[in-house]
């Protein structure tokens, strides 16, 4: 279906400006605040996905992608760099991103598939949006522990 490819194309294109503006955003805002913004936006995006049945609205909701994946990658790299010992920074980046990308690529489709079959797509999207809430709470905890 052309709408599926439009959604993924738009989503990918919208990420590019955020990657390009990454260093500016990190200078202007703290990594944890950007990460909190990402968690909120992912939560809202998934809740709105769950509440709509119109494929055109789903495509429009891809605008939220500007604030999600690119910010998560940029800020997580910065945070890992900051907390890693100097000698382990490269390895830390590699391991953390492997866990982040590989772990989520394994766990989320498995959980989403199971939930979709058992509770339906819309409820699955709502449940998955809770991961954004969990992430937000963990970011607040990390911020508290760093102070």
Question: What are the language-model segments listed below?
Answer:
Residues 1-14, 93-96:
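Loop-to-transmembrane helix entry
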Residues 18-31, 116-117:
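Helix-to-loop junctions at the C-terminal end of transmembrane segments
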Residues 33-48:
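Structural signature of the two symmetry-related core transmembrane helices
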Residues 89-118:
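A late C-terminal transmembrane helix in Major Facilitator Superfamily
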């Amino acid at each position: 279906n052309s709408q599926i490819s439009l959604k993924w194309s738009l989503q990918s294109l919208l990420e590019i400006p955020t990657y390009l503006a990454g260093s500016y955003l990190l200078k202007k805002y703290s990594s944890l605040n950007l990460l909190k913004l990402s968690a909120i936006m992912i939560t809202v995006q998934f809740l709105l996905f769950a509440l709509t049945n119109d494929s055109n609205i789903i495509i429009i909701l891809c605008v939220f992608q500007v604030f999600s994946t690119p910010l998560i990658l940029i800020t997580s790299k910065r945070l890992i760099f900051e907390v890693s010992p100097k000698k382990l920074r490269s390895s830390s980046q590699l391991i953390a991103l492997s866990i982040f990308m590989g772990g989520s690529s394994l766990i989320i489709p498995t959980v989403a598939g199971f939930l979709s079959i058992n509770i339906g797509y819309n409820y699955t999207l709502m449940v998955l949006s809770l991961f954004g809430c969990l992430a937000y709470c963990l970011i607040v905890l990390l911020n508290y522990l760093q102070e």
